[in-house]
């Protein structure tokens, strides 16, 4: 902000200058505050399930200090940071319980949502424990939901975000492909792995389309996770963990910092 030094010997000039400064101050006071708060919405891929270092006050939402929203906020120091993403969240949960911090002062919103609506957890359980035909059938059911029902649910969430945070830049974060193909992978056939990856692509396509329709940016993490899928030499995803089943198929801390954070940095 410029500083003005008033030099004058005539009272009329002093008064005129004072009036000018008063007008300028009034104009400045009328300007809205900058929108530079950050709100992180979504499901377990945003809250950081699988990354560890969970914030105790987040309870079952399992928000991690190693999750990409937390890492981004630590690096960029937004004026405010509200972390409402929650493990297990569906679109309805975002609408009912996560949008409170959004306002005209929100400058950035990130969100990953849709996987739970499409039945991701049940699909993966079916593919791991049941036959190839059962796996493919369950994937087909999930894809049909993604085509027929999910777009409307995403539109409801995205419209609500725009209404509550009209000045925000919104980044819709996608999901990785889960398996490296062409390698030996215990427990899952190549056919199952291929179908699961295609289902992830299918979901990402719909997410990107609906994001674009609302003027949002889509953050595609499939490229950053290439070479770090399950059955690769250095996976950034947890495989099935029977001792902590909730972390299965979720990004590790390295997946959050190396797979998700660069995408958010580039899109924000």
UniProtKB/Swiss-Prot annotation:
Pfam families: Lipase_GDSL_2. Disulfide bonds join 61-86, 127-135, 185-231. It catalyses: a triacylglycerol + H2O = a diacylglycerol + a fatty acid + H(+). Residues 1-29 form the signal peptide. It is found in: Secreted. The active site is at 44 (nucleophile), 250. One of its GO terms (cellular component) is extracellular region. Its EC number is 3.1.1.3, 3.1.1.-. It comes from the Bacteria. GO terms for biological process: triglyceride catabolic process. Strongly inhibited by Ag(+). The cations Ca(2+), Mg(2+), Co(2+) and Cu(2+) do not significantly reduce the lipolytic activity of SCO1725. Is also inhibited by DTT in vitro, but not by EDTA or by the reagent masking SH-groups, p-hydroxymercuribenzoate (pHMB). Is resistant to PMSF inhibition, except in the presence of Ca(2+). Is also strongly inhibited by 3,4-dichloroisocoumarin (DCI), another inhibitor of serine hydrolases. Addition of tetrahydrofuran and 1,4-dioxane significantly increases (2- and 4- fold, respectively) hydrolytic activity of lipase towards p-nitrophenyl caprylate. Its main location: secreted. Keywords: Disulfide bond, Hydrolase, Lipid degradation, Lipid metabolism, Secreted, Serine esterase, Signal. Coiled coil: none annotated. Optimum temperature is 20-30 degrees Celsius (DOI=10.1016/j.enzmictec.2008.01.009). The His-tagged protein shows a higher optimum temperature of 55 degrees Celsius, and a thermal denaturation midpoint (Tm) of 66.63 degrees Celsius. Is stable when incubated for 30 minutes at temperatures in the range of 30-70 degrees Celsius at pH 7 (DOI=10.1016/j.enzmictec.2008.01.009). Optimum pH is 8.5. Shows high stability over a broad range of pH 4-9.5 (80-100% of enzyme activity). Becomes unstable at pH over 10, where the activity drops to 34% at pH 10.5 and to 8% at pH 11. InterPro entries: SEST-like, SGNH_hydro, SGNH_hydro_sf. It is an enzyme of class 3 (hydrolase). SUPFAM superfamilies: SGNH hydrolase. One of its GO terms (molecular function) is triacylglycerol lipase activity. Monomer. Belongs to the 'GDSL' lipolytic enzyme family. Catalyzes the hydrolysis of fatty acid esters with a preference for mid-length acyl chain (C10-C16). Is able to hydrolyze the triacylglycerol triolein and mixed triacylglycerols from a wide range of natural oils; better activity is obtained with corn-, wheat germ- and olive oil that have higher content of linoleic and/or oleic acid (C18:2; C18:1, cis). Tween detergents are also substrates for this enzyme. Displays arylesterase activity towards p-nitrophenyl alkanoate esters and alpha- and beta-naphthyl esters. This is Lipase 1. It comes from Streptomyces coelicolor (strain ATCC BAA-471 / A3(2) / M145).
């Amino acid at each position: 902000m410029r500083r003005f030094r008033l030099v004058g010997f005539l009272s009329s000039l002093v008064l005129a200058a004072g009036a000018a400064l008063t007008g300028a101050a009034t104009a400045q006071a009328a300007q809205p505050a900058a929108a530079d708060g950050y709100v992180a919405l979504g499901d377990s891929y945003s809250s950081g399930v699988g990354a560890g270092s969970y914030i105790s006050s987040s309870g079952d939402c399992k928000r991690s200090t190693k999750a990409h929203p937390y890492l981004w906020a630590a690096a960029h120091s937004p004026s405010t940071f509200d972390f409402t993403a929650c493990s297990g969240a569906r679109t309805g949960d975002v609408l009912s319980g996560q949008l409170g911090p959004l306002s005209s002062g929100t400058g950035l919103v990130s969100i990953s949502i849709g996987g739970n609506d499409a039945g991701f957890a049940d699909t993966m359980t079916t593919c791991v424990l049941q036959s190839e035909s059962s796996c493919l059938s369950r994937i087909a059911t999930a894809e049909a939901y993604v085509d027929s029902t999910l777009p409307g649910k995403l539109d409801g969430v995205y419209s609500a975000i725009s209404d509550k945070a009209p000045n925000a830049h919104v980044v819709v974060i996608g999901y990785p492909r889960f398996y490296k193909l062409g390698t030996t992978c215990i427990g899952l056939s190549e056919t199952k792995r291929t179908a699961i990856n295609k289902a992830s692509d299918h979901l990402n396509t719909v997410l990107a389309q609906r994001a674009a329709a609302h003027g949002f940016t889509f953050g595609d993490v499939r490229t950053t996770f290439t070479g770090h899928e399950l059955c690769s030499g250095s996976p950034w995803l947890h495989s099935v963990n029977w001792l902590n089943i909730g972390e299965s198929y979720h990004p590790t801390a390295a997946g959050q910092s190396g797979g998700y954070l660069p995408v958010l940095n580039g899109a924000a």
